[in-house]
Amino acid sequence: MSLTLNDGDFVTVIGGNGAGKSTMLNMIAGVYPIDSGKIEIDGVNISRQPEYKRAKYIGRVFQDPMKGTAAGMEIQENMALAFRRGQRRGLGWGIRANEKDYYHDLLTRLGLGLQNRMSSKVGLLSGGQRQALTLLMATLQKPKLLLLDEHTAALDPQTARKVLDLTNEMVTEQNLTALMVTHNMKDAIQIGNRLIMMNDGRIIYDVSGREKQNLTVEDLLAKFAEASGGQFANDRMLLSK
């Protein structure tokens, strides 16, 4: 596999079950080692760096809303941890007043009322609220790469749409480089500036710009059948078109 991302690329990733989408993200993040080749960010080879070191450059939001936050800590404490990602840590006075004001402003933009619950434990939040908070935390220090692994799949449709809209807004406003795995083909077409389709661990289709904007779900189904010699039989993608 060979994949190059340009600065500011917002790439949606689709493919059948077992196509290798999540595996690709896990290799980039350092969860799985690569057998050969290399992974570079801004020309720096990070292939041998452990996951915790890559976290300095890479933000990530998982499918499970329970991941990405510390349930037993307050909202503001979670944000403080994310704010200090990649920094040396020592003894201090905790969260400073100006930090609280900053977190309050950021939480207000989410439109979920979390700015009024900064002292609440994260474990008391709904799945959608936790996922929105995780997204905010993942982008707090503007990562060089944001990985989104079906991060709306476990949410109800209304909440999923809210989180997806927030995602699009944050990535666009901050000009982030992002990879978003999704099973929803409509979202894959409408969100981002580039789309890649995977099958059996390979990228079989890579489209961007106006060509992507003009795509339809039927085009994607036909492209998959053409490239793979099969169809999305019994696949969740058929339920999300």
Task: Give the location of each predicted region.
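The feature captures the beta-strand-to-loop junction immediately N-terminal to the Walker
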Residues: 14-16
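Helix-to-loop junction immediately C-terminal to a conserved catalytic motif
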Residues: 29
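Conserved ABC transporter NBD signature motif
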Residues: 37-45, 205-207
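Q-loop/switch helix immediately C-terminal to the Walker
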Residues: 73-85
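ABC ATPase C-loop
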Residues: 138-139
